[in-house]
Amino acid sequence: CHSDPAALAALHFGEWAKKPVEKRWAKLFCQFDRVVSPSRYIAQRLEEAGIDNIFIRPLGVEIDTFRPDRRDRDWLLKRLGLDSDARLLCFAGRPAKEKNVDVLIDAVQKLGAPYHLVLVGAGSGMPDEDRVISLPYEKDPRAVARIIASCDAFVHANDKEPFGLIVLEAMACGRPVVGVNAGGVAETVDESVGQLAARADADDYAQAIEALFARDIEAIGRAARAKAESQFAWNRVFEDLCMLYGDLTGDAAFVQPSEAWAVH
């Protein structure tokens, strides 16, 4: 289960929509022998809905696609028309309400120079804002990786994120992450790989960005890459998931580590 449809229903239609969707959610998932959750946050939401047999297994990241050597800051600065002293904050994703892109925009406005927010895909249809640059949606993940790696930090303000795969992709690119201390992102991001804002609020978020840049962001970025490699590379994640499948089927040899790599 990689989403919280009840929370999304409440966000878009009001709190009245939460319970009916939650009941439908529980009715569906209670039919399964195992329910796999990508985070403790979603596991708790499942338990609240009356679902059991929950196992937490995170998603994985393509560490060969998202990697630090795609970084080309001079190329990106030239594309954006910015000077070398600019501090580039990147967000890539859908322009959905739950992403709290407005919090990112307001935070950058509060910070002022030299910060700039680069929205990849998420700025579609939004009015022009000072210090906010919208880039089109990129289908090629390598193109996304190049942009993320070429920025200084990745920003993500969704406080109800089930997991946050794009956050892992930014970490794999060697970029520190500024998140919110809520939802699935808070289980991945800590001070070793970034900074967490107390709330999804422009003031708190701006403070978190400043706190990150007061530290050694390159060292933090290297730690982020190391964590992505050691804990979230797909060969490791896939092996753990297949062990769960093997336990369910009674086949302890469901997959071997070398096979997990080959299948991926």
Show where each model-derived region lies.
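Membrane-proximal helix-turn-helix segments that form the acceptor-binding/catalytic region
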Residues: 18-34
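Carbohydrate-associated surface elements
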Residues: 41, 60
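Conserved donor-binding/catalytic core segment of Leloir-type glycosyltransferases
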Residues: 83-99, 105-108
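Nucleotide-activated donor-binding/catalytic signature segment of Leloir-type glycosyltransferases, i.e.
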Residues: 121-142
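Conserved acidic donor-binding segment of nucleotide-sugar-dependent glycosyltransferases
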Residues: 137, 191-202, 211-216
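Short alpha-helical donor nucleotide-sugar binding micro-motif in glycosyltransferases
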Residues: 146-151
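Aromatic "clamp/platform" in nucleotide-sugar-dependent glycosyltransferases that forms part
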Residues: 159
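Short hydrophobic beta-strand element within catalytic cores of glycosyltransferases
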Residues: 176-179
